[in-house]
Swiss-Prot record:
It catalyses: Hydrolysis of terminal non-reducing N-acetyl-D-hexosamine residues in N-acetyl-beta-D-hexosaminides. The active site is at residue 361. Residues 96-117 are annotated as: Disordered. One of its GO terms (biological process) is glycosaminoglycan metabolic process. This is Probable beta-hexosaminidase ARB_01353. It is an enzyme of class 3 (hydrolase). It comes from Arthroderma benhamiae (strain ATCC MYA-4681 / CBS 112371) (Trichophyton mentagrophytes). Induction: Expression is down-regulated in presence of human keratinocytes. It comes from the Eukaryota. GO terms for cellular component: extracellular region; membrane.
Amino acid sequence: MRFAKALAITAVLLSGVVEATSDAVIEEALKAPTINPLPGPVTWYLHADEGRKYLAPFVSYHGPHKSGIRDAWERCYSTIRRLKWYPQALEGPIPKFDPFPDQSSKPKEKRQNAPPGAMIRRVRVKVKDVDAKLAHKVDESYSLTVSAKSEAIEIEAQTPWGARHAFTTLQQIVVYDEKSQRFYIERPFTISEGPLYPIRGILLDSGRNFISPSKIKEQLDAMALSKLNVLHWHITDTQSWPLQVNTYPQMTEDAYSKRMVYSHATIKEIIEYARQRGIRVIPEIDTPSHSSSGWKRIDPDLVACGNSWWSNDFFPHHTALEPNPGQLDIAYNKTYEVLENLYKEVSSLFEDEFHHLGGDELQPNCYKFSKHVTKWLAEHPDMTLNDLLQEYVDRTLPALDKIKHRRFIYWEDMLLSEQIHAERIPRNVVLQTWNGGLDNIKKLTSNGYDVIVSSADFFYLDCGNGGWVSNDPRYNVMRNPTPGTPNFNYGGDGGSWCAPYKTWQRIYDYDFASELTGPEKEHILGGIAPLWSEQIDDANITPKFWPRAAALAELLWSGNRDKEGKKRTYLMTARINNFREYLTANGIGAAPLQPRYCLKHPHHCDLYSDPNAVLG
């Protein structure tokens, strides 16, 4: 079920309900331009005729002290006091330009100032179930009220996790007046909301390049501010094995260095850091594909095609889609013993109820290098690699589940790949889709599978940076060979298979459930935006994720449409620009989205002046 259905918030002024026309929505934004948190509520109560609410020199806390709620408030309040934040990108009226011969525009009213309300002296927090565990579909809803005559900020939530979201909203709404040197909230208001989807996350890949624990925590801080709640941690890959495994300590010989290893203590520290911010960590040990480093240290026979030339200088003979090659030999009995032992240790480290088993991009040519697979095919002349993979699925899922019960996730390839696929995947396995966009989402949900959306054409954050494999003659071209027609170096992808670069608008405008029936929509658990790390490490991971991941955050929390079903892209522009500034003020190195001129001149950098240009 679509989680909480965004709680069906209604927007009203004291004088009545706001019409949901674009002009009315813009007018509403102008009445309190500093109240523009991300994710943006679809609609909310605004007391537009009331004045500012100043904060007392000290705001006291009145609420639960357990489950980390008090600690979350202290982080919120200390951030407010330290940053002395004032929004850097405010919403403005529809610009008036010198008209083209038949163009005209009408001026917009400015909001009227009103006398300030009662000073805010305390925050009062009520949580119905303070012991609620952080888990899939936990209630994350909250209400946040600042009334004109009250001296308290009122927060109500079902669980500690909703209260945390209220704090991150409040952080973005309290601003600082340099002239009076006082903190204030521009207008009394009430926000009451919850997420559309229970899984809202990003994928961090530490297998291609190592990502330090401090940088992982930086991503968690940004996630918490934007209400993302799942870190999909793709820990290992063929290129390296950075995870400490006590059962097989030799695996970390394939880490890039002894310093580039996640110890058990570090893993637990990251998980706890995430939990304190309302974020679950879902581990992925990608198997049976993308498996060479680490595995081969246990037994070289565990890995097929590990010593092959990945492209064979002739792509029809490739053994991997990128260097270095290697897949678990699924016809070798010892593979299953090692998998079970490894899962037992990893599942004891990661407490989440979901566990990702990988399963993407299996290459048939790789198994031509396996004596065990060759023998199996000879002994089963009527069977194919699809049948062998089915045997792998039927053998591993029950065995792993018996060790420690989890809900397993596979990449969709395990069922839909044209290369190698199983014929049957249990319906209780979640499938994460990255190919085929709307078509694959429809195909999976119509067949009864719960789905996590990671469509590469919309959500892949590493795309559009050209190729990274070296000694590539395709770049050695001095003149355009096909003028007027895009090709590799001239208007083409330049070696990035998933080009172009995914802008925040591309992410935000993705209506991934638009072609689904009601029952099919119930199978969408949410979305995760991957950032594969072939060209990513500590130096650039944060600006690659942020602020684009914030567009995903709003899409999955409150949606990209207003309550009348119209796209909110026009008003999202100032909101995400401002959120980027808020991230950088917090020491999170998010990339700029536009020249600063655009922040200072709202909508002067739009492609079209019509606020309804983005249709849906």
